[in-house]
Amino acid sequence: MLVIRSLTSALLTHNQSSSIDSRPSPWMTPLAYALGSWVVLPSYFRIHVTGQENVPRDGAVILAPTHRSRWDALVVPYAAGRFATGRDIRFMVTADEVKGLQGWLIRHLGGFPVNPRQPAIASLRHGLEILQNREMLVIFPEGGIFRDKQVHPLKPGLARLALQAEASQPDLTVQVVPVYLDYSQAFPTWGCKVNVRIGKPLQVADYTQGKPKSEAQRLTADLTTALKRLAGTETEVMETVNGAGESMPVCLQHGQMHG
């Protein structure tokens, strides 16, 4: 999974649309959810979900999970998708993550491939379209898989996209929902325990009064704090985000970093 790393002025205007189609299939998507939720995940993991009531049942929503495993693309729909909340989920994935059985499930659960190094404008527009259509989009704000339990510095792309969407329609009311994923094993195997903790949503409209750059930084900082609380981490330090000299809080836990 990846985070959108940059947004440009070429992003969606009201009369533009992307060429990407990630709409759920009327018959394949229910099958994928059934296989994932009733067969694959329950037979492989022991999953415990808390905070499902915090996922809005309608409106434009960005789910912002930590990223610990390729399995996340199946665990998040299990915890917050069709069978849990009545809502379908869309999310961006790397090309490698749409291969094999896992990839088949991911594609039919709403995943669409994006180049993580040079995401096409069409991919960014599609993410914006999803929010403008008041649907639910998953963005992994850490920007990559980290196999420890720390909350790593968040990339700024999620906040920028959220603010871009909020500015595009005055009544859109975009919400960002923090999600902490915790696996009992760094490289999950059969019987691994998975805890999914879903926090209260952040209202993007609360971050529209100042300059876009500073408000994006503030939203990113508040999302980091929310993820830290879900993780139960204790030590907060300032880290540089994406090498750009922008400081954001990141929470550290004791223990060795694996990823």
Can you describe what each PLM-predicted range is?
Residues T29, G36-H67:
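Helix-to-loop junction immediately C-terminal to a conserved catalytic motif
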Residues R57-Q118:
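Catalytic core of membrane glycerolipid acyltransferases/transacylases, capturing the structured
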Residues V49, L63, F91-M92, V176, ...:
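Generic preference for hydrophobic
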